[in-house]
Amino acid sequence: MRQDQRSYNELRPIKITRNFIKYAEGSCLIEMGNTKVIITATIDDKVPPFKKGSGEGWITAEYSMLPRATQQRNVRDINKLRLSGRSHEIQRLIGRALRAGINFKALGERVIILDCDVIQADGGTRTASITGGFIAMFDACKKLYDDKVIENFPITDFVAAVSVGICDGVEMLDLCFEEDSKASVDMNLVMNDKGEFIEIQGTAEGGAFTQEQFEKLLELGKQGIQKIIEIQREVLGEDSKLIGSVPKDEKTSGCDQE
């Protein structure tokens, strides 16, 4: 039994509040245990230079934390006059993950910018940002579709993420901060609703892990993500039927330009 009385294969309580911010084209508040992230989606008609004239869109993300999202105050990136390496790595991950679930041609020549702001951190902020970012991205796409700006709904797959790790020799799902800080192995998994992997990030902290342990972590993460996608589906309700209306084989894959 873990410190919060969960079993090793149990997710923290998840709550997603859709349309959390009034002015954004898409938004949500995602809560995974004590981790809370606000994500907004903004539609911008200016595409990156490598997409100009292509007829294709793009998804990008920014990530930051409130100074007191953690137990000790963190200095804002803007006060350091540069983006921290951690924030840069995380926002690239969020963008890559969500681009895997969209048809750029169907989106048209525009960008959806996802701003992920952590208001309380207790582990898994990047995976929560991806899972909640999908909902915000969905609602931005739905606005374009409902307003008849685009002809076809561009999201091809559900996308969600979760952390897994090994603590005290035990493989665990959805680590809180205390577990993450003492884990001998720490991994982040991103998958779609077809059971396909989008990204696997894994690190052994000062040791090594076996293939058997790796496969156990993958299976734990897969089961967790399936449950998270069911929560996403429930949050979207009937709207979720729009997903996959563009055939997957028409999807244009994107490179990681950011």
Curated annotation (Swiss-Prot):
Its EC number is 2.7.7.56. Phosphorolytic 3'-5' exoribonuclease that plays an important role in tRNA 3'-end maturation. Removes nucleotide residues following the 3'-CCA terminus of tRNAs; can also add nucleotides to the ends of RNA molecules by using nucleoside diphosphates as substrates, but this may not be physiologically important. Probably plays a role in initiation of 16S rRNA degradation (leading to ribosome degradation) during starvation. This is Ribonuclease PH. Homohexameric ring arranged as a trimer of dimers. Disulfide bonds: none annotated. It is an enzyme of class 2 (transferase). PANTHER family: EXOSOME COMPLEX COMPONENT, EXOSOME COMPLEX COMPONENT RRP41. It comes from the Bacteria. One of its GO terms (biological process) is rRNA catabolic process. Keywords: Nucleotidyltransferase, RNA-binding, rRNA processing, Transferase, tRNA processing, tRNA-binding. It holds the Pfam family RNase_PH. PROSITE patterns: RIBONUCLEASE_PH (PS01277). Belongs to the RNase PH family. The gene is rph. GO terms for molecular function: 3'-5'-RNA exonuclease activity; tRNA binding; tRNA nucleotidyltransferase activity. InterPro entries: ExoRNase_PH_dom1, ExoRNase_PH_dom2, ExoRNase_PH_dom2_sf, PNPase/RNase_PH_dom_sf, Ribosomal_Su5_D2-typ_SF, RNase_PH, RNase_PH_bac-type, RNase_PH_CS. It catalyses: tRNA(n+1) + phosphate = tRNA(n) + a ribonucleoside 5'-diphosphate.
